Amino acid sequence: MITVFFFLGCDSKTEKKTTKIPLITKSIGDDGAIIEKGKEIFNYDLDLLAQLPLRNLPIIDSTTFDNVEKSGVYDTGFLKRIKFDPGCKDATNFRLKYKIPFSENFTSIVVSYQCGEHELLTTLITVNKKHKIIDRLQIAYDEIAESAFGKRSQVEKDKIVITSSNWMNEEPIFETETYALLNNGKFKKM
C-alpha cells in the first residue's frame, strides 16, 4: 500500500512541459533564394532528372519491348506531379529514359510506358522550369499483339522525323511526319 501512495504522490508533483517546434514553411531553392513551400521545386525531382542520361543529337529512338528496360529509371511519381496524361487509362510501367539538350529554357525528357499488355509508347515531353508540361510528341511505338505496327524517330537539332510502319499487307506501308521543336518548347508539324 505504501508503494501505491508513493507513486500517486510523485505523479501529482510532476509538471509536464511541452516544447513546440515551429514548422518550417520556407525552403531554399536552387539559387539559394528562400521560396514559399507552395512554390517549392521538389529536390527529389531534380535528383531524379539529374540521374537521367543526357543523349547528344542526332538520336534514333526505336524503343521496343525488347529494349525498353535497358535505359533510364522507373518513374517514382515525377510524371504524376507534372500532370502527364498518357492518353490511355491502363498505362503502366512508366520509365524516364533520357534527356535531350535542346534548350536551357526547358527540359526535354523521353518517357516510355505501356498501354495495356501489348502496346509500348515512347513520348518526348518538354517541361518548363516550374515543372509544367509545355508539349509532348510520340516518337516511338511498338505493339506485340500482331507485331504489325511500329514507329521510330530520328531526332536532330532542327527537326524530328517520325516514321510509322504498317506490316498488315504484303507490301509494308511507311509514312513519315516531320516536326520542328520551337524555341518555346512546342512541337510544330512541318
PLM ranges: what are they?
Residues 6-9:
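C-terminal motif of bacterial Sec signal peptides marking the signal peptidase cleavage site
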Residues 95-104, 152-157:
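Structural signature of eukaryotic scaffold interfaces centered on beta-propeller domains
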Residues 1-2:
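Sec-dependent signal peptide recognition
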Residues 105-115, 157-166:
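Short beta-strand elements that form the blades of beta-propeller/WD-repeat-like
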